[in-house]
């Protein structure tokens, strides 16, 4: 094997400085910037006043925002995917080395070429592929060297054989030449004699011919003169005859005319005769017809009778003949058999007699021979016994001598073989040692030569690059300056037609690659080129013109089983189609491979040998496209689509499901996923590279579009192509035909200006194009065509539902159609670094071998004796086979004869009928005979020219026999050129490997959560995976993984160690970095068999995420043997509560809300709320940011809760009215609510829940909880469905008597994390009704409370209602005055008035001024028996008052004092069914001195409030002095010093007493009420 010395320069390379240095170095100096958290992350009850940065989420626990990433983490992630160094890979070359040795031995010139650098394999598959390529290359080289060696050996042998053969052939050719020369000379002499005789005969014949020719020519001239004379006479006679014939014809035609007239009259008369004859004939014919019918019937009967008789007669005669013949034949056969039998038996008897004689003679001969045999046999046996005894004696002497010789030789051989074995052992040790020296020398030489060759190549490259560097740098800087200037101009013109709306330089030069090499892999089916050609041939109109038009291809011709092949086959206008044209490239050569895909299947195309493509001036070596037939494609007529993949990647693909029938509501889309690679076979990471999306046609029945793409759409100003709903197409107009559907130009070329825009070289091709700005190593875009009505509404101009072909040709390239887009063609050059020259090795000297021992001389073995052959025994005679006599033939049997048949009898015939007689017909008169045609004279016969006499035949000069060609002297064949000594070349290959790594992020259930959401406090695991180590790798001496963790991630060292067996795990708290080093046992496993791949172990980091709205990004570094380092991909997970999260569009702040609403659903936060009103609290359970969450089952089991910390001093809960619904109003089940009077009254589980969420309730609270957290998570949380809780609460009635503010706050708890709502504040106004006593309606008049009212005096109770402040929450439904007066002292007159106490604003904007009479808006009820008057505002009036308006009214009840005494009175003001008592008024009526006898006043009927009467001012009678002895007329006899029963001397409790009295006595339940909201 060719050994290659392993050289690791890692310790001095950039790997140590960049990869490890970035992590390990930063880890040593990084300063932790993450707040230290308690071990129990859910316990947050610390009272320390620590200033922290919060997230914008109203979190109650763990509110801190995520800190800045550590320097180590930032630097590591910035270098994600980067690699330094590589691991060498060895591949065996034993067969190649042997082939080289054999070639040298055969004399072949062997040259070792420079070692082939196979580069660096970056994946296991690529590594295996490259190792296979090297093995294949070695095998191929060995095979070629073997073939060359064998061929050369055969050529040497063949050369010698050919030389001998040619010498023999040259001699035979010379002998043959001499023989042919002699025969040639004799033939020449013979031919010359014959030619002289033929020439003399020819000259005599020529003289006679010339004489005969002159005589013939004279006779022909005389004949011509005679013919001319006869011709003149003939022409004169012909003229005379023609004139006479014309005159005769004229006379004949006149006679014919006259004859015709006469015959016409005769014909008329004959017609009458003809009719009479026809009548007579018709009668005769009828009779004749009947006769013939009768006759025919009789004849038929006779014929049938005759036929029957003849048939029977014939059958009889045939049968008679057959019987007679059969009997005769039988008789003749019998007689012949008797005769033959007699003859045969006579012959047999004679033969049997001869057999008897032959058998007797044979027996006598046999007996004599047997006697002689027995005598000869006895003599032979005696001679053989004597010979055998002599042989046995000689054999015994031979065997004794042989044994002696063999033992002597065996002893000599054993001694020799031992000496040989000893010699071999010594030399084997020397050879082994020399082989090691040789291998070490060869390895050192190979390594040195490889290094030297590389150094020389690197040095030449360095010198060249050094010389070119200034020019390259200047060219780069000049181009950058030009681009910068161009971008300034583009910015000025970005709104002009054809310019990019977002100016940019094109960093991707990817316009045309006609020489690209294509390879395909697919899970669909590859198609044969012959099948594709056969399918194209059905397009006879184009195919016959040698045009390949994919748009017409009927894919149903590609669906047969034998159309499929296992490997890619190219088709196009090349090979036997060279000179054909295509609609893809006209006369340009176009090649493509074909596949057949079902929906969802894909084909991966790898394009290599790229020559003209660059990114930022850097060469692109390879492009890989994955084309997938989109599952949403709606083509109908087939289930598979054809993809023609062009070898030029910039031409794209042609996709078709067209079967010859256009389809409605159809579509075909291809998803394109692609990656570009540089010359080091590394994916190119694009940074806003522009990809052209062009030729997006839109007709009224079809739209071509791009969708589902990575990157950003860049519009070209003036283009019809735009972006809508994430799709790129002509969004606003058609672009097919000028003037149609807003199209500015016509797509195809015609006479219109600007037409033909749909061509890459059209100046306005930008009209149907746009661009996509892409970033990252891998991008994607889906392109296709769809029926217009599937995208936009049906329209007779813009979108018609006609059929279309489900096919499209599209290309994705860098040919941006916008004008003046500058291209970046120059890569920024890197200053070259000079290589280091290697040192030549010192070679070891091989040791000489021991000489071989001398072979011994052996004795010859004796010659064995030869036994004299035995005499053969004589042959015993065989007894003869005697002949058997033949038996006689049996006599023939006499035949039995048949009887002859009976002859038939004929039936008599019927008689024939009488035949009718034919009538006598009249004879028609003959016509006049036609005139006789004249006899014309015959025209004279023209003279016949006498033929010329033929000229005599001129004799032909004889063909003289040519003299034979003399034989050519043979040219001796040249002896063959000796074979040229061939030269064979061979080389070794070097290969490096870069094992790939991958970081995965999972939740506690092992679910991948990369780029998703998990709840705060969730356990998050990072798995650090490395692909299998390749076969042929060097020994693994170290295997280290370093992971700088994200801030806000609580690392669990113990759990990490448990999950990372096979590694020593350490954690640096200062830099928040964990390091894993493979243990010795793990390294031993890796090194157990270096010739085979080995799977690696992977450690797992375990911890929790602690911040709301945080993004946790992480990658790690793998370092192997200090020779290879690589940084992994970056994984990312986010916690909810982060707006503008690119991975989770629904993510936003977690903000539960609480809003107070009235029953109409209006927001009443901050408004005045009347006692007795119901607050419809609307609690929003904010879950939309959790959409797509992938939290673990452990996190889900922490549950989902909603807490309402309500003010129990002001509100009563209404659990019967609680509702839970989703955002669409659908009722939600599975959520329970429980009310607790205090935290202490709640279960321990609830107390712990609130404590861990850091929520402190003030008193009573409600707890809403998900009954089944897992189902709740599945249905609402993971779907991002927020819930709305309607939680009605009623303001306590007694709270209106004191008034005051009340506050309300709620919390949602998700996964154990709490979030608070805003505080909702409302105020309950204090309602304080007032009562006065007045004598007028003037509100400024004196209040008589506590004063005197005269007997029979009319006065008013002024009832001032409570003030309803402005900005109140509820409409007034009830505002009433209930006065329970003392009917013993007061009499209600039935008159009242109600006035507005202040300005009122109505909902329609009108204003009712203070003091306005509102009596008409009230109703009154009187209970005279119990002394109760109720004045109630009409509800429809109350509801017209604006909520923004205050309200207060007062009512005057007119009373008459009818008794003496002191009377007290309180009224009740009811507001929305809540009663408020007024102050108590007291008045006294003294005994009048001379009272008039009162006139009884009838109890008045209630007045119609709609027609009020103004109460009259009562007249107070002047008291008269009465006789003191007369009794005083009072209604109730009381002592003057005693208060009435309705009075009291303590009014402090009267409001409550009055309310109780009204409820108990009057029954407020009888007042008109609104129905309860729950009904």
From Swiss-Prot:
Annotated motif LPXTG sorting signal, positions: 1539-1543
InterPro entries for this protein: Adh_isopep-form_adh_dom, AgI/II_N, Antigen_C, Cross-wall-target_lipo_motif, Glucan-bd_C/Surface_Ag-I/II_V, LPXTG_anchor, SA_I/II_PAC_V_sf, Surface_Ag_I_II_A_rpt
Record's note on what induces expression: Induced by growth in the presence of collagen (at protein level).
Coiled coil: none
Gene Ontology CC terms: cell surface; extracellular region
Compositional bias per record (Polar residues), positions renumbered to this chain: 1539-1548
Ag I/II A repeat extents: 146-220, 221-302, 303-384, 385-466
Oligomer and partners: Binds to human integrin beta-1 (ITGB1).
Family that this chain belongs to: Belongs to the antigen I/II family.
Function: Adhesin that mediates binding of bacteria to a variety of host cells. Plays a role in the bacterial invasion of dentinal tubules. A host immunostimulatory component, it modulates the innate immunity response. Plays a protective role against some antibiotics and cationic antimicrobial peptides (histatin-5, HTN3, but not beta-defensin 4A, DEFB4A). Purified soluble protein stimulates human epithelial cells to produce IL-6 and monocyte chemotactic protein (MCP-1, CCL2) probably via interaction with integrin beta-1 (ITGB1).
NCBIfam families named among the record's database cross-references: isopep_sspB_C2, LPXTG_anchor, Streccoc_I_II, strep_RK_lipo
The protein's name in its UniProt record: Streptococcal surface protein A
């Amino acid at each position: 094997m060719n050994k290659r010395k392993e050289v690791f320069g890692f310790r001095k390379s950039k790997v140590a400085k960049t990869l490890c240095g970035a992590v390990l170095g930063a880890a040593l100096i990084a300063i932790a910037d993450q707040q230290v958290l308690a071990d129990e992350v859910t316990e947050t009850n610390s009272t320390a006043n620590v200033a922290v940065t919060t997230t914008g989420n109203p979190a109650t626990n763990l509110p801190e925002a995520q800190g800045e990433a550590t320097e180590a983490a930032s630097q590591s992630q910035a270098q994600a995917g980067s690699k330094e160094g590589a691991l060498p890979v060895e591949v065996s070359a034993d067969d190649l080395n042997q082939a080289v040795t054999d070639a040298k031995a055969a004399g072949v010139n062997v040259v070792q070429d420079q070692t082939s650098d196979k580069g660096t394999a970056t994946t296991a598959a690529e590594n295996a592929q490259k190792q296979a390529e090297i093995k294949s290359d070695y095998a191929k080289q060995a095979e070629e060297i073997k073939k060359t060696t064998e061929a050369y050996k055969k050529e040497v042998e063949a050369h010698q054989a050919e030389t001998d053969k040619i010498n023999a052939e040259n001699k035979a050719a010379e002998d043959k030449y001499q023989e042919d020369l002699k025969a040639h000379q004799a033939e020449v002499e013979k031919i010359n004699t014959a030619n002289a005789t033929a020439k003399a005969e020819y000259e005599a014949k020529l003289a006679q011919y010339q004489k005969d020719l002159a005589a013939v020519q004279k006779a022909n001239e005389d004949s011509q003169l005679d013919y001319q004379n006869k011709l003149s006479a003939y022409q004169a006679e012909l003229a005379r005859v023609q004139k006479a014939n014309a005159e005769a014809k004229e006379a004949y035609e006149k006679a014919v005319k006259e004859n015709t007239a006469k015959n016409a009259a005769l014909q008329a008369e004959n017609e009458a005769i003809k009719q009479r004859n026809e009548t007579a004939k018709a009668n005769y014919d009828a009779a004749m017809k009947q006769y013939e019918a009768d006759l025919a019937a009789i004849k038929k009967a006779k014929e049938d009778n005759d036929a029957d008789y003849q048939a029977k007669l014939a059958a009889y005669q045939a049968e008679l003949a057959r019987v007679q013949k059969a009997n005769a034949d039988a008789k003749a056969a019998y007689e012949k058999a008797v005769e033959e039998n007699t003859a045969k038996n006579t012959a047999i008897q004679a033969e049997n007699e001869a057999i008897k004689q032959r058998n007797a003679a044979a027996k006598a001969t046999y007996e004599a021979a047997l006697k002689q045999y027995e005598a000869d046999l006895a003599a032979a046996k005696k001679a053989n016994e004597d010979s055998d005894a002599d042989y046995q004696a000689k054999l015994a002497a031979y065997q004794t001598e042989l044994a002696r010789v063999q033992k002597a030789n065996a002893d000599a051989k054993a001694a020799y073989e031992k000496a040989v074995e000893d010699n071999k052992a010594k030399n084997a040790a020397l050879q082994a040692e020399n082989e090691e020296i040789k291998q070490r020398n060869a390895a050192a030489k190979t390594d040195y030569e490889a290094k030297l060759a590389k150094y020389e190549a690197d040095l030449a490259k360095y010198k060249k690059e050094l010389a070119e560097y200034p020019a390259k740098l200047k060219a780069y800087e000049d181009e950058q300056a030009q681009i910068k200037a161009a971008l300034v101009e583009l910015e000025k013109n970005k709104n002009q037609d054809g310019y990019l709306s977002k100016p940019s330089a094109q960093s991707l030069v990817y316009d045309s690659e006609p020489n690209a090499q294509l390879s395909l892999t697919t899970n669909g089916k590859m198609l044969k080129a012959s099948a594709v050609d056969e399918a194209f041939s059905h397009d006879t109109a184009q195919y016959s013109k040698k045009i390949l038009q994919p748009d017409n291809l009927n894919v149903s011709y590609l669906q047969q089983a034998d159309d499929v092949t296992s490997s890619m086959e190219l088709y196009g206008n090349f090979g036997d189609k060279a000179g054909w044209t295509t609609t893809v490239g006209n006369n340009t050569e176009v090649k493509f491979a074909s596949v057949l895909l079902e929906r969802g299947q894909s084909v991966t195309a790898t394009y290599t040998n790229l020559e003209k493509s660059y990114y930022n001036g850097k060469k692109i070596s390879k492009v890989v496209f994955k084309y997938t037939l989109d599952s949403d494609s709606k083509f109908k007529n087939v289930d598979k689509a054809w993809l023609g993949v062009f070898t030029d990647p910039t031409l794209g693909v042609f996709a078709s499901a067209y079967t010859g029938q256009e389809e409605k509501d159809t579509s075909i889309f291809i998803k394109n996923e692609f990656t570009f690679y540089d010359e080091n076979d590394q994916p190119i990471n694009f940074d806003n590279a522009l990809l052209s999306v062009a030729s997006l046609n839109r007709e009224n029945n079809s739209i071509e579009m791009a969708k589902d793409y990575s990157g950003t759409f860049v519009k070209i100003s003036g283009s019809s192509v735009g972006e809508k709903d994430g799709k790129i197409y002509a969004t606003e107009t058609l672009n097919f035909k000028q003037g149609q559907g807003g199209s500015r130009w016509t797509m195809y070329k015609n006479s219109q200006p600007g037409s033909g825009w749909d061509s890459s070289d059209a100046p306005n091709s930008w009209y149907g194009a746009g661009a996509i700005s892409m970033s990252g190593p891998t991008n994607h875009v889906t392109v296709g065509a769809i029926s217009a009505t599937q995208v936009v509404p049906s329209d007779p101009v813009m979108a018609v539902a006609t059929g279309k072909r489900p096919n499209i040709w599209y290309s994705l390239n860098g040919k941006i159609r916008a004008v003046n887009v500058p291209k970046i063609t120059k890569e920024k050059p890197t200053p070259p670094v000079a290589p280091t020259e290697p040192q030549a090795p010192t070679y070891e000297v091989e040791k000489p071998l021991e000489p071989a021992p001398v072979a011994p001389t052996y004795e010859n073995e004796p010659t064995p004796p030869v036994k004299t052959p035995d005499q053969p025994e004589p042959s015993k005679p065989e007894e003869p086979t005697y002949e058997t006599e033949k038996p006689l033939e049996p006599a023939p049997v006499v035949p039995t004869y048949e009887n002859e048949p009976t002859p038939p009898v004929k039936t008599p015939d019927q008689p024939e009928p009488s035949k009718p007689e034919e009538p006598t017909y009249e004879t028609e008169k003959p016509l006049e005979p036609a005139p006789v045609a004249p006899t014309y004279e015959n025209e004279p016969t023209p003279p016949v020219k006498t033929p010329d006499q033929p000229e005599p035949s001129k004799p032909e000069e004889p063909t003289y026999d040519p003299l034979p060609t003399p034989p050519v002297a043979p040219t001796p064949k040249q002896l063959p050129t000796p074979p040229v000594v061939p030269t064979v070349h061979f080389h070794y290959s070097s290969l490096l490997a870069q094992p790939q790594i991958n970081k995965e992020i999972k939740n506690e259930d092992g679910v991948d959560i990369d780029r998703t959401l998990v709840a705060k406090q969730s356990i998050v695991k990072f798995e650090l995976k490395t692909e299998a180590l390749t076969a042929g790798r060097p020994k693994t001496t170290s295997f280290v993984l370093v992971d700088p963790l994200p801030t806000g991630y609580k690392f669990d060292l113990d759990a990490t160690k448990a999950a990372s067996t096979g590694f020593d795990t350490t954690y640096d708290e200062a830099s928040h970095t964990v390091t894993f080093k493979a243990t010795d046992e793990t390294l031993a496993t890796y090194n157990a068999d270096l010739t085979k791949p080995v799977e690696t172990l992977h450690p797992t980091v375990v911890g929790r995420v602690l911040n709301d709205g945080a993004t946790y990004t992480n990658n790690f570094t793998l370092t192997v043997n200090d020779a290879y380092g690589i940084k992994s991909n970056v994984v990312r997970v986010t916690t909810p509560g982060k707006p503008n999260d690119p991975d989770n569009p629904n993510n936003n702040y977690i903000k539960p809300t609480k809003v107070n609403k009235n029953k109409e659903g209006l927001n009443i936060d901050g408004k005045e709320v009347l006692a007795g009103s119901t607050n419809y609290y609307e609690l929003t359970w904010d879950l939309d940011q959790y959409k797509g969450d992938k939290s673990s089952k452990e996190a889900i089991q922490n549950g989902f809760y909603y807490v309402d910390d309500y003010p129990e001093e002001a509100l009563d809960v209404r659990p019967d009215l609680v509702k839970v619904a989703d955002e669409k109003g659908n009722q939600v089940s599975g959520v329970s609510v429980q009310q607790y009077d205090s935290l202490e009254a709640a279960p321990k589980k609830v107390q712990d829940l609130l404590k861990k969420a850091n929520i402190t309730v003030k008193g009573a609270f409600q707890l809403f909880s998900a009954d089944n957290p897992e189902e709740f998570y599945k249905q609402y949380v993971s779907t991002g469905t927020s819930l709305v809780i309607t939680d009605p609460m009623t303001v306590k009635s007694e709270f209106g008597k004191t008034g005051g503010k009340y506050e309300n706050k709620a919390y949602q708890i998700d996964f154990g994390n709490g979030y608070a709502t805003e505080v909702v504040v409302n105020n309950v106004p204090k309602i304080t009704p007032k009562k006065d006593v007045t004598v007028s309606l003037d509100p400024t008049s004196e209040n008589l409370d506590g004063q005197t009212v005269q007997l029979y005096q009319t006065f008013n109770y002024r009832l001032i209602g409570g003030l309803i402040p402005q900005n109140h929450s509820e409409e007034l439904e009830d505002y009433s005055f209930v006065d329970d007066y003392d009917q013993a002292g007061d009499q209600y007159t039935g008159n009242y008035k109600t006035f507005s106490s202040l300005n009122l604003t109505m909902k329609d904007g009108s204003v009712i001024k203070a003091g306005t009479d509102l009596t008409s808006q009230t109703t009154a009820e009187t209970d005279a028996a119990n002394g109760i008057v109720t004045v109630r505002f009409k509800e429809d009036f109350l509801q017209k008052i604006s909520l923004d308006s205050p309200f207060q009214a007062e009512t005057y009840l007119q009373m008459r004092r009818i008794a003496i005494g002191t009377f007290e009175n309180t009224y009740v003001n009811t507001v929305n069914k809540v009663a408020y008592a007024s102050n108590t008024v007291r008045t006294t009526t003294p005994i009048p001195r001379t009272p008039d006898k009162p006139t009884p006043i009838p109890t008045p009927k209630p007045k119609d409030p709609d027609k009020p009467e103004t109460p009259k001012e009562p007249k107070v009678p002047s008291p008269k002095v009465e006789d003191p002895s007369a009794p005083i007329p009072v209604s109730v006899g009381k002592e003057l010093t005693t208060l009435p029963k309705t009075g009291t001397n303590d009014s402090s409790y009267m409001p409550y007493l009055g309310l109780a009295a009204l409820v108990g006595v009057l029954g407020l339940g009888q007042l008109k009420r609104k129905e309860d909201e729950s009904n």
